Amino acid sequence: MAKAVTVKIRLVSTADTGYFYVTKKNSRTQTEKMVMKKYDPVARKHVEFKEAKIK
């Protein structure tokens, strides 16, 4: 069996609400930490989400 190319990551809200998304990324092509703007329903606005490890 070969090692999986995609890994699951957790996108944590920078608004410190504790809200997060779980998504996948290709660790070979995207070596830097992922940052994206998504909707945070707790803060009720779009904020940046930064990559963190899934525990």
From Swiss-Prot:
Coiled coil: none annotated. SUPFAM superfamilies: Zn-binding ribosomal proteins (SSF57829). One of its GO terms (biological process) is translation. Pfam families: Ribosomal_L33. One of its GO terms (cellular component) is cytosolic large ribosomal subunit. Disulfide bonds: none annotated. Keywords: Ribonucleoprotein, Ribosomal protein. Belongs to the bacterial ribosomal protein bL33 family. PANTHER family: 54S RIBOSOMAL PROTEIN L39, MITOCHONDRIAL, LARGE RIBOSOMAL SUBUNIT PROTEIN BL33M. This is Large ribosomal subunit protein bL33. It comes from Methylorubrum extorquens (strain PA1) (Methylobacterium extorquens).
